[in-house]
Structures are given as structure tokens and as C-alpha cells.
Amino acid sequence: MQGPGGNVSRGLPGGPASTVASGAGRCESGALMHSFGIFLQGLLGVVAFSTLMLKRFREPKHERRPWRIWFLDTSKQAIGMLFIHFANVYLADLTEEDPCSLYLINFLLDATVGMLLIYVGVRAVGVLVEWQQWESLRFGEYGDPLQCGAWVGQCALYIVIMIFEKSVVFIVLLILQWKKVALLNPIENPDLKLAIVMLIVPFFVNAFMFWVVDNFLMRKGKTKAKLEERGANQDSRNGSKVRYRRAASHEESESEILISADDEMEESDAEEDLRRPVKKKHRFGLPV
């Protein structure tokens, strides 16, 4: 005759004991959104996003973006990455074998094939914007003063690019039948699996992606040069030509003095006025 302790030791079918045993060493469906998984995701977001702050301080001082411009640039990328992250979490639950492995495969595809697609998308959008002369939709330019509508429009364009990228990656995932791949099966600790999938691998890959994509979205030096060239052309059309000359004094021998065309005309008129009396004296034979 068995006591209550015997029943507990064996466990009832489908009871808590058997559930824990069957789930030991497995990354089960929904594990990515458990409390430990959410904690790792938040920690990853803070650490990875801090690389963008490091990137800003490493920019040359004459090209360093003001904090407001930097925030507008990086916030677009943060929104896009959040979309990709939650899309990967949703797609990871499509498999019953190992969601952690599927999330990791999705993430690595985003970091390789996805990076190329993002680059192509940003370049294609840039060509379209230049062709249509949509000034407010140029990535990294928000007007002077800053316009919230420009940021909203650029953010919407970037989300469209991310939707395109994620759709292509999902198609590749289906074609290659990678839903059945279980990369992390040799690892028995489910918390270690989550740490690898949500923190360790994504930290290095996300830092690289944030750094590179920020270069895609920020205002380029070529764009600045084009704007300056346009301003110079507009000034020349208005007739305000400018040239440089060397200073005549010894103390300022290495300095350059900017002289406008109007100043030159005033100097030439003054010299002409001084020469007129001399010419008249020569004409009448008077001593100069």
C-alpha cells in the first residue's frame, strides 16, 4: 500500500513535476517573453544603444552632430530595431522545437542579408527623394528650425524599409527550411540559452549594426558640400561675387582679407577722383 509520498515522487501525468522534467534544458515557446527574457532584452537595448553615444564622441569635432540632431537620427534607428526585434520574437514562436534557435537564426540573417537590404533601401529612397526634390525627406536633414514633420516622414520611410527587409528575410527563412534547425540543442540550461540569444551574441552584432546603419541615416558630408555649393551658386547669381587678397602690412602678411565687389568699386571710384585734378593740370601745363 502506497502512501501520499509515493504518488508525489512519481508525479501524475501532466502534473507540475512532469512538466518541469519535460521542459528541463529546453527553450520552450513563449520563453523569450518571460521575465528573465524581458530583462535581458532591456539590458541589451541600453548597452547596444550606448554604442551610438560612443560613436558620436568619436566623430570629428567639426562634423559632430548637435544632441538634438543626434537624437532624431538615432531614434529612427531605435524604432526600426524595435520593429525587427518583436517581429523576430513573433516568428520564433512559429516552431515547436526551439524558439531560441529560430530567433538567433532570424537575428543573424538580419545582420547579414538584412544589412545589405537596408543599405539598398536607403540608397533607393535617397535617389527617389533627390529626383522628386522632397527636401524634408532627406535622411538626417530636419530643416532650420527643426521640423517635427520632417522626422515623422523620415521615420515612416525607414519603417517601410525595415518591413521590406524583414519580409525578404522571412521568405529566405521559409525557403531554406531553417525553422527546423536547432542550433542550441547541445546547451541544456534554458537560462543560458536565453542569455546567448538575447544578450551575448546580439550585443556584438547590434553594436556593429547600430554603428553602420547610423552612417546610412546621418547627414553626409557630400550633402553638406552640395548645399554649400548651391548657396555659392545662388550668391553668384545675385551678383555678390567674393574674392580674397593678401594683406599689405607686415603684421598681417599671412592673413587673408575678404573683399566684396562693392568695396572694390568704391576704391576704384576714389582713385579715379584723385586722378582727375592731376590730369587737368597736365592738360593746362600747370605744375603738379
Swiss-Prot record:
Q: What does this protein do?
A: Acts as a regulator of store-operated Ca(2+) entry (SOCE) at junctional sites that connect the endoplasmic reticulum (ER) and plasma membrane (PM), called ER-plasma membrane (ER-PM) junction or cortical ER. SOCE is a Ca(2+) influx following depletion of intracellular Ca(2+) stores. Acts by interacting with STIM1, promoting STIM1 conformational switch. Involved in STIM1 relocalization to ER-PM junctions. Contributes to the maintenance and reorganization of store-dependent ER-PM junctions.
Upper lineage ranks?
Eukaryota, Metazoa, Chordata, Craniata, Vertebrata
Family membership: Belongs to the STIMATE family.
Identify the GO cellular component terms for this protein.
Answer: cortical endoplasmic reticulum; endoplasmic reticulum membrane; endoplasmic reticulum-plasma membrane contact site; membrane
Q: Please give the start and end residues of each transmembrane region.
A: 29-49, 69-89, 102-122, 156-176, 194-214
Region annotated Disordered, chain positions: 228-288
From the UniProt record, give one GO term of the biological process aspect. Answer: activation of store-operated calcium channel activity
Where does the motif GXXXG motif lie? 149-153
Here the segments flagged for biased composition (Basic residues) are 277-288
How is this protein named in the record?
Store-operated calcium entry regulator STIMATE
Q: What is its main location?
A: endoplasmic reticulum
Specify the superkingdom: Eukaryota
Q: Which PANTHER family match?
A: STORE-OPERATED CALCIUM ENTRY REGULATOR STIMATE (PTHR31735:SF2), VACUOLAR MEMBRANE PROTEIN YPL162C (PTHR31735)
This protein's species is Rattus norvegicus
According to the record, the residues making up region (Required for localization in the endoplasmic reticulum) are 241-246
Biased-composition ranges for Acidic residues?
261-272
